[in-house]
Each structure stands twice: as C-alpha cells, then as structure tokens.
C-alpha cells in the first residue's frame, strides 16, 4: 500500500514504464533464464489468463499445459463465455502463474510480505478450431 501526500513535501515514488521494454523485469537480477521458466511452467498447475473486452481487462484462472516443442501455453475453456468471446474479438493477452513461498512477517503491516516464484508472459491468444490440430497438440 502506498500513500503519499505531495503537499507535505513527501517525494512521490514512481516507475517509468518506458524506461525498459514493458516485458522486462524492473529488477534485472531477479530475472530467470528460459530453462528455469520452462521447468517452472511444467510444475505449476494453474495460471491466470488475461484477455480484453474493449478497454476492460478480464482475468480467468485455468489449468494449462506448456508445450516446449512449440514454446506455447495451452488451456481449455468453454465454447461459449467471456474468455472465448474476448479471444475471438482481440488477440492481445497475458498470462501469469505463481507458487507461494515463505511468509515474511513483520510487526508493521506495511513491511509484511511473502516470497514467491512466478512467470508472466505477454502475447496473443487464438482459438484452435480444427479437430486435427487439437489432436496434434
């Protein structure tokens, strides 16, 4: 939680999203290599897919499967519903999955935190229509 009041002379903290490409970590020394990411994607069972409906983001938890052959993430959704509708209207999407680590308690609520590992991906989403292609995957 951040609460800053500029009138009291508090310096506002900011992050410039244009400083680095948007798909790069803000803290470079915490980035993981492709080998770690692939191993992690094969262990985690649930991810969160984000699609867009005009300007409204929509997040949906789902089981998924990572194909190291195609370097793609696959999931199954309902033939009708928000995810399917969004995927057919706009292909921009993002994905996140994580695994919780240790709780890092503190006597001060704002300093409490927890450790975690995660993968975040940006890309496009598409509906696989053909039965033959579904079977191949």
Describe the predicted segments one by one:
Residues 48, 52-53, 83, 126-131:
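Short helix-to-loop capping/linker segments positioned immediately adjacent to catalytic or ligand/cofactor-binding
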Residues 2-28, 102-137:
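Charged, gly/pro-rich active-site loop segments
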Residues 44-79, 95:
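Short beta-strand segments
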Residues 9-13, 36-40, 58-73, 105-118:
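Short N-terminal helix-initiation segments at or just after the protein's N-terminus
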Residues 89-90:
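Short nucleic-acid-contacting surface segments enriched for D/E, G, S/T with interspersed K/R
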Residues 19-48:
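Short, basic/aromatic recognition patches
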Residues 80-85, 94, 102-103:
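Histidine-centered metal-chelating micro-motifs
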Residues 78, 98, 126-128:
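Solvent-exposed residues in well-ordered beta-strands and their adjoining turns
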